[in-house]
């Protein structure tokens, strides 16, 4: 075991537990008809659930409830632009500060406890005790609901510290390989005893800001990812971009958040003036508009592939096969222009039915050769 596993992580868990029990010990009054919805995971996860969130407002079960939505701060602009009507108020969680700053953690959990919720629903399928479950556990809610899920790969210590009966009700959410948008719809509409609605992620978006000076014809590359193992070599992106420029006359537009700057700057340095670097220059809504006007997106497994699919942009996404089925490939009924590209070994296991999606290392996508990506793009290109 590493020093992190032996010392750092147990110390973090001890600190988190101390804060949790300190908050739980503080008296708080439960108030009637106050519903908490927890969806604090990432942008892609939000895209795959947002069309279902309005069902709570329309339901008989929660008619007249004051609804509070708790989300990841990275999704705030999407929520405020498209979905603010689904809740009476929203609370935004900075997950980095929540994991690193015990004062922030304490005050955030205290805010949830003192809000006096009567009901709490955790909308996250892959949950962890230290983050997602504690948001519900500190609340005053008498009725707590979540999806039944398989265990995450956590340490024996964290498993021991996780309370045995966190939720008063666990709903079956379908097979592990079920596409998450379908899983979310099934869970929410089943919980509310409402007929299911067609599953969609579609978003309407306007023109990109004129100040971005986009080329007339272009494709988008998103080389960065919040997960350090979800990487495809810079030289592979560059070789792919050069071929698309030669073959189709398109300009590569590099996009990403400021956190992706290491990957985007490296790619822009290789491609030079033949590319446009928009790293850190687009809001999420701006990025949607850029993707809407693009001929296609080439990206690793990250939220960008779901943003692109939501505005009808053709997606060529690189995936390891980890969580196969949940986030890719997209069902044909949702889009026919989403092309998930996997390493050869993963593809063989998919064909033979031997793929254990959780056992695939996330970093396997680095093994995908440029030639394979170009074959998929050429085969599915639309002028």
Question: Where are the regions that the model predicts?
Answer:
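Catalytic machinery of carbohydrate-active enzymes
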Residues: 1-383
